[in-house]
């Protein structure tokens, strides 16, 4: 992906085609820290796209009225990677996933029920950060996938 990054504080993001990447520099053991940090980034700095339900008539319906099979709303794959240096931090990955999904909801997709694939991993890296990759799996018409995520390395 060669798109330019938009940055505000410790958060940066970019998008191209059906992929959005979000990175947060640094780590903390408090998962709740990430939600307001990412929300602030999207509120103050992000000028990229937002999820769309299509026509005005479609927007009038509640998300709970959308089909759960992804038809009309699209399904997504989300990969969350915690890169650390030295000893791994004591942070429950399920709490991290919930905080990140809550933070990007409304920016990458409408509702976390649209997430059909979720991968959360902790790994040693060159610098401490949280890296999130969101990919659209199905078209707005519920058709064939745009991208299939390769198997976990």
Predicted segments, located by residue:
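Acidic, proline/glycine-enriched N-terminal capping motif
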Residues: 1-153
